[in-house]
């Protein structure tokens, strides 16, 4: 199959279950909302070594937020309920409570499952906290140096999906990078998904476990490493490909990940020098969710 003249391999991405909390952070303007969102989602690329996977999802217009201010939705992802609650409390407490002009609201108001994160963080007020209503939501006002920090009592979470992916293969590193950035930019407009790696792009595509070093949880995916193409039996690098980037997508549901994959591939294949698009799957070792690339177009 070809998209914009570029071969898209008839294969699938293999994704896995994860729990996702969705948070709305608002601020005085988009800059300060972004600062807090960016801090709160740091060190969140992969559960292989990070305490959570996290990323900025999408902008929120002032007309869409409980306090009428601009904001960003973020997602924090963890394999366990306990771990997710701990990460939510730590990241909101250390990275958003501390940031200028921010407020925090539940990004999944209809979720059946919630954490009382706002209730817990209100104790920072040391007895001066006050229950308030903002946009019809139960919140807490925490007096601080700049004024009151507002946080909603509950933050919702859901069973989501992590590890949706596709690979961009190109003739040069600059063309691969330009295509990957174009893909991430397109995906940033899709509601319900994040691309948790640096700039949304994975340079170090990995496989589950390792062939030589058995103590590793993950190791380089040598079949996708152009510099050792001639040394690797079963290499997946076509002739003429000098660089590969992977886009990893987490989302609230499969439909959101599929749409993000679709628009990402459409954007990437418009960049000159892109040779092929494929995806990563691991023989069922990683997860049960299958995203067939050929079904997206």
From Swiss-Prot:
Documented EC number(s): 2.3.1.101
Entry's Gene Ontology molecular function annotations: formylmethanofuran-tetrahydromethanopterin N-formyltransferase activity
> What reaction does this enzyme carry out catalytically?
N-formylmethanofuran + 5,6,7,8-tetrahydromethanopterin + H(+) = N(5)-formyl-5,6,7,8-tetrahydromethanopterin + methanofuran
Question: Mind listing the UniProt keywords for this protein, alphabetically?
Answer: Acyltransferase, Cytoplasm, One-carbon metabolism, Transferase
Claim: Glycosyltransferase is one of the keywords in the record: no
Main enzyme class:
transferase
| One of the GO BP terms on file | one-carbon metabolic process
Q: Name any GO cellular component annotation.
A: cytoplasm
Its main localization is cytoplasm
Where found? Answer: Cytoplasm
Its pathway, per UniProt, is: Metabolic intermediate metabolism; lactate oxidation
Which HAMAP family did the record assign?
Answer: FTR
The protein's matches in NCBIfam families, at most eight in alphabetical order, are given as: one_C_fhcD (TIGR03119), PRK02114.1 (NF002554)
Q: What does this protein do?
A: Catalyzes the transfer of a formyl group from 5-formyl tetrahydromethanopterin (5-formyl-H(4)MPT) to methanofuran (MFR) to produce formylmethanofuran (formyl-MFR) and tetrahydromethanopterin (H(4)MPT).
The text of the family note is: Belongs to the FTR family.
Subunit structure and binding partners: Homotetramer.
Question: Can you name this protein?
Answer: Formylmethanofuran--tetrahydromethanopterin formyltransferase
Q: Could you tell me which species this protein originates from?
A: Archaeoglobus fulgidus (strain ATCC 49558 / DSM 4304 / JCM 9628 / NBRC 100126 / VC-16)
């Amino acid at each position: 199959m070809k998209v914009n003249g570029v071969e898209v391999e008839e294969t699938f991405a293999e994704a896995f279950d994860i729990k996702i909390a969705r948070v709305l952070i608002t601020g005085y303007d988009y800059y300060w909302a972004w600062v807090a969102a960016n801090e709160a989602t740091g060190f969140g690329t992969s559960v292989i070594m990070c305490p959570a996977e996290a990323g900025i999802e999408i902008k929120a217009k002032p007309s869409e937020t409980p306090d009428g201010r601009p904001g960003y939705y973020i997602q924090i992802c963890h394999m366990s309920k306990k771990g997710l609650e701990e990460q939510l409390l730590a990241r909101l407490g250390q990275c958003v409570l501390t940031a200028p002009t921010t407020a925090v609201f539940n990004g999944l108001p209809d979720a059946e499952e919630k954490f009382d994160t706002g209730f817990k963080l209100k104790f920072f007020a040391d007895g001066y906290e006050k229950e308030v209503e903002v946009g019809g939501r139960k919140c807490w006002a925490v007096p601080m140096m700049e004024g009151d920090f507002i946080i909603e009592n509950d933050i919702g979470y859901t069973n989501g999906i992590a590890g949706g992916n596709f690979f961009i293969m190109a003739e040069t590193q600059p063309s691969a990078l330009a295509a990957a950035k174009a893909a991430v930019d397109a995906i940033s407009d899709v509601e319900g998904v994040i691309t948790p790696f640096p700039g949304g792009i994975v340079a170090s595509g990995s496989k589950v476990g390792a062939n030589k070093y058995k103590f590793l949880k993950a190791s380089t995916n040598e079949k996708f490493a152009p510099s050792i193409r001639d040394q690797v039996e079963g290499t997946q690098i076509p002739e003429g490909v000098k660089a590969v980037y992977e886009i990893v997508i987490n989302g609230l549901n499969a439909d959101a990940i599929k749409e993000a994959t679709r628009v990402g591939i459409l954007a990437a294949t418009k960049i000159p020098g892109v040779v092929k698009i494929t995806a990563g799957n691991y023989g069922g070792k990683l997860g049960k969710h299958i995203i067939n690339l050929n079904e997206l177009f």
